[in-house]
Amino acid sequence: MPKPLFHGVCASSITPFGSQGALELTRLGPHLDWLIAEGVDAISPLGSSGEFVAMECEDRKKVLATALEKIAGRVHVVAGTHDYSTRRTIELSQFAQSHGADSLLIVPPYYMAPTPSQVMDHYRRIAESVSIPIVLYHNIPLTAVDLKTDHLLKLYEEKAIGGIKMSNPEPDRICEILQATDSQLHVYAGIDTVAFEGLCHGAHGWISGIPSTVPRAAKELYVAIAVEKNLDRARLLWTKLAPLMRLQFQAYHSRGEGAHWFSTMKAALNMIGPPVGDPEPPIAPLPESLRGTLAKLLRDLGYTVKS
């Protein structure tokens, strides 16, 4: 019997690379241990933060197998098994399930912009090939695929998906889907800038950059909203997180120059946790000119920053 989907915060674990793009999997275990010690409820290997787009299929399998072995059931694992190809997505999904994944995170086929009906068939075929829940990674800005609420509800009714990571700045859609399914379809806030509103609407959890970068701070916010129902405390915690979010997403929202969200994330993790290395090109490391600002923001959130 598959495990139910999780409630809480989910960190998208990073993939450590060395020179020339070689995997450095010895670094992955300490990173996963740190995330769990920080209090995350789930981990998603090979989400966006895992740089799956930079990896060959066999390397993705190595990361999934290593992560699942190291996590060893301590938290829920939402394995990222996305690929443009339905065939390869099924291959990766079956591999993840066979190695103990609790659920799957799958972004719609990207770049070629298939029609909504083709995207829905993609998910149906994957669901037929596995017996664990699928979390549909709804990310319009990065996939150019916009499944409307009716499409998502249809997939849920057909049991093709069990959850949605909503990575669009539309907290009202989180509310709409939760109301339409009596909160039975798990909906996760998937973009940091609207996570507060999404959690207040009743989202089951939060999967995004902040839970992956400063998990303890993200968990405190989730608990304040979802468990304690203490909005005064939640607003205070959100206000403390906001400057880090602004730094992390300045280039993402402007589509211009500035700190890339992933450069900021890896730099932060190197400052406060086990070393994880730099992003794979074309994403460059965080500029030295921003590292002092980032270090101060992390200290303001209660983290000890390594010199």
Kindly label every feature range from the protein language model.
Residues 81-82, 108, 112, 137, ...:
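Glycine- and other small-residue-rich loops at beta-strand/loop junctions that grip anionic moieties
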Residues 38, 62, 66-71, 95, ...:
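Alpha-helical structural signal in soluble globular domains
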Residues 74-75, 133, 162, 184, ...:
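Secondary-structure boundary/capping positions in well-ordered alpha/beta enzyme cores
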Residues 2-146:
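Active-site beta->alpha loop and helix N-cap motifs at the rims of alpha/beta catalytic domains
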Residues 128-129, 140-250:
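Catalytic alpha/beta core domains of metabolic enzymes, predominantly
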Residues 5, 10-14, 38, 203, ...:
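C-terminal alpha-helical cap/extension of soluble enzyme domains
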Residues 23, 30, 58, 62, ...:
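Conserved active-site and cofactor/substrate-binding residues in soluble primary-metabolism enzymes
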Residues 29, 61, 65, 90, ...:
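Generic alpha-helical structural signal
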